[in-house]
């Protein structure tokens, strides 16, 4: 699924003409016939729901009989992994004037349709919507969500600047909510280019939705299933949104959208929280116990801040998005990590939570950073596309967050609290997005940091802590903001796995080398059913496991039951006890007035 993917922008294929000693020659670049009047139609109703599928049609006009080459994206921006959505396509067909057209495939996600002349052509297929993932599509008996990257084809080699119209067919009484711009008819939408049409996740079916104006922007909150997020819980989410959004807009001096839509799915079985950002919306899938939980607020804040940082303020390597291949960048720690810094900070600045919430979240990021060992932020940013198995596949989130935190303190200290990381974000946002959408380079990032820091060089910081692998200088930097880090050592029983959660439970994504699970034969891909007497289905289950075995000696035998394919497998493990260092970020009672001023400005803006 994450294998190297050939560039569909270049479209260069090697002709395998090696018979008789012939030398392989490159073929011409893939290029579709020109298309006009592109319309998409999406169907989700009771009939398609029975097969957990979404019906898709694409109609367009051709000028002649030249072949039309249509490609489906391989990934959704923000996910940084190749999902190859073409594998979920079934029943592909093409027709014109009521007659079937010939078609074949050029590669595994590009279809070649052969029109018989000028006129309207319609291609259709069914998309299997059974993947509970924020970058994919998922359906139940009366509800579905989809991402445009899953459903909408584009003409290969013709650029992505074409406008389009989207029509959604569904049952009478079922709702549609999306960030797309409404068209002239009900359930009809328009998009200025392909980037826009695929960046608008959509709910169809039965769900709750309401709206409010926040800081001059219409905000919609859509939640599935009906009735789950109601009353005080829904009011809490709205209060949090009212607090966080103005605090974010203040960093950039504007809200870049006319409307914003928060889409939330709470399945019956889901073990955590997963969300994905878009230009004027985001889609999240959550454990039901997280309704109105502070963790939910943190995730929502993260995705909303992305509407500025990465959807608009974006590394140059990601401008424009190329939907057919990976786009690695060394700057993902800025796009994701610094967003992780601002998400919790915005909740404090917006009055949603007290500073202690930010301290606790940051202490968790520090612990994750220290536990990961020596890994450079730039290296981790590049490696995310291959998902390293050493536990560092997402380290650029917490380590990038604390890098942003330290930079903010250092900029404030260098300028006597006259400037901050806010100035860096605002400067780059306006120069590399608003004035001309070029994206920012590494050089532009550090030049902006230098300017904000009053000309102070941050070359040493970059060399040691971003490109380098040195431990972060907590004891040198935190006191500048009247803060200090305290540690405590505990000993905890661990199973020895890295879990990921979905609607089936806790799946083993990787194993701790030489850990108890690896030694007993647990395999990547297994689903944990039970560990000792503890039923495992979500993150809280592991807290129960640790509590149950807290007083047991190392080496105590216990059984683990895993689901492996269609079979349940019982394995015998020996208890392993691991030393854990707990870290807390606290205010220094002996801090200077200058340090307190920096801390207060950081926490409350300014």
Identify the residue ranges that each predicted region occupies:
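A surface-exposed beta-strand-loop module
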Residues: 46-47, 51, 59, 78-140
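Juxtacatalytic substrate-recognition/specificity segment
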Residues: 58, 208-332
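Short, hydrophobic/aromatic-enriched beta-strand segments in well-ordered soluble domains
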Residues: 56-62, 72-74, 112-143, 164-172, ...
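Bacterial N-terminal signal peptides
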Residues: 7-20
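Intrinsic-disorder/low-complexity, polar/charged segments enriched in Ser/Thr/Lys/Arg/Asp/Glu/Gln
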Residues: 39, 53-57, 67-69, 110, ...
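Zn2+-dependent metallopeptidase catalytic core
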Residues: 81, 85-94, 150, 157, ...
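C-terminal recognition in membrane/secretory proteostasis and scaffolding
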Residues: 343-344, 352-606
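Early extracytoplasmic/domain-onset interaction patches
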Residues: 26-75
């Amino acid at each position: 699924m994450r294998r190297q993917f050939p560039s569909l922008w270049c479209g260069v294929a090697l002709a395998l003409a090696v018979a008789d000693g012939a030398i392989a020659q490159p073929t011409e670049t893939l290029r579709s016939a020109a298309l006009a009047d592109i319309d998409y139609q999406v169907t989700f109703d009771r009939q398609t729901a029975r097969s957990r599928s979404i019906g898709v049609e694409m109609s367009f006009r051709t000028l002649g009989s030249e072949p039309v080459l249509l490609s489906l994206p391989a990934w959704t921006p923000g996910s940084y992994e190749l999902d190859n959505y073409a594998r979920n396509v079934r029943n592909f067909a093409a027709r014109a004037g009521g007659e079937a057209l010939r078609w074949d495939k050029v590669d595994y996600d590009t279809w070649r349709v052969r029109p018989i002349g000028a006129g309207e052509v319609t291609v259709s297929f069914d998309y299997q919507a059974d993947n509970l993932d924020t970058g994919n599509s998922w359906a139940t008996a009366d509800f579905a969500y989809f991402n445009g990257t899953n459903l909408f084809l584009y003409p290969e080699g013709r650029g992505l600047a074409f406008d389009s119209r989207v029509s959604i067919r569904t049952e009478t009484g079922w709702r549609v909510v999306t960030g797309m711009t409404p068209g002239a008819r009900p359930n009809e939408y328009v998009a200025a280019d392909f980037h826009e049409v695929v960046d608008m996740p959509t709910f169809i079916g039965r769900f709750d939705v309401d709206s409010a104006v926040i800081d001059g922007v219409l905000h919609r909150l859509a939640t599935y299933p009906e009735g789950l997020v109601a009353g005080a819980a829904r009011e809490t989410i709205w209060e949090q949104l009212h607090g966080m959004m103005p605090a974010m807009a203040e960093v950039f001096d504007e809200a870049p959208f006319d409307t914003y839509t928060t889409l939330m799915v709470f399945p019956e079985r889901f073990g955590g929280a997963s969300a994905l950002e878009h230009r004027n919306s985001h889609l999240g899938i959550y454990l039901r116990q997280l309704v109105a939980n502070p963790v939910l607020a943190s995730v929502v804040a993260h995705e909303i801040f992305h509407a500025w940082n990465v959807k608009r303020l974006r590394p140059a390597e990601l401008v424009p998005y190329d939907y057919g291949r990976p786009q690695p960048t060394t700057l993902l720690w800025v796009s994701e990590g610094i967003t992780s810094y601002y998400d919790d900070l915005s909740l404090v600045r917006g009055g949603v939570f007290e500073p202690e919430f930010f301290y606790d979240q940051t202490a968790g990021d520090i612990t994750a950073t220290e536990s990961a060992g020596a890994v450079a932020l730039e290296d981790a940013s590049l490696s995310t596309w291959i998902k390293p198995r050493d536990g560092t596949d997402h380290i650029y989130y917490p380590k990038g967050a604390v890098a942003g935190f330290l930079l903010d303190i250092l900029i404030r200290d260098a300028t006597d609290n006259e400037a901050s990381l806010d100035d860096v974000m605002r400067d780059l946002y306006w120069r590399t997005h608003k004035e001309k959408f070029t994206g920012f380079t590494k050089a532009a990032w550090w030049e902006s940091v230098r300017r904000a820091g009053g000309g102070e060089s941050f070359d040493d910081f970059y060399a040691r802590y971003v490109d380098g692998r040195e431990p972060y200088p907590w004891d040198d930097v935190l006191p500048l903001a009247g803060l200090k880090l305290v540690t405590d050592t505990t000993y905890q029983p661990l199973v020895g796995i890295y879990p990921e959660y979905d609607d089936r439970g806790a799946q083993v994504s990787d194993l701790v080398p030489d850990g108890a699970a690896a030694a007993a034969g647990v395999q990547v891909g297994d689903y944990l059913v039970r560990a000792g007497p503890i039923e495992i289905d979500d993150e809280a289950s592991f807290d129960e496991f640790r509590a149950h075995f807290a007083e047991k000696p190392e080496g105590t035998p216990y059984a683990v039951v895993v689901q492996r394919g269609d079979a349940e497998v019982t394995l015998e493990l020996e208890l392993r006890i691991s030393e854990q260092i707990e870290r807390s970020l606290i205010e220094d009672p002996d801090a200077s007035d200058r340090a307190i001023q920096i801390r207060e400005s950081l926490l409350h803006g300014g």
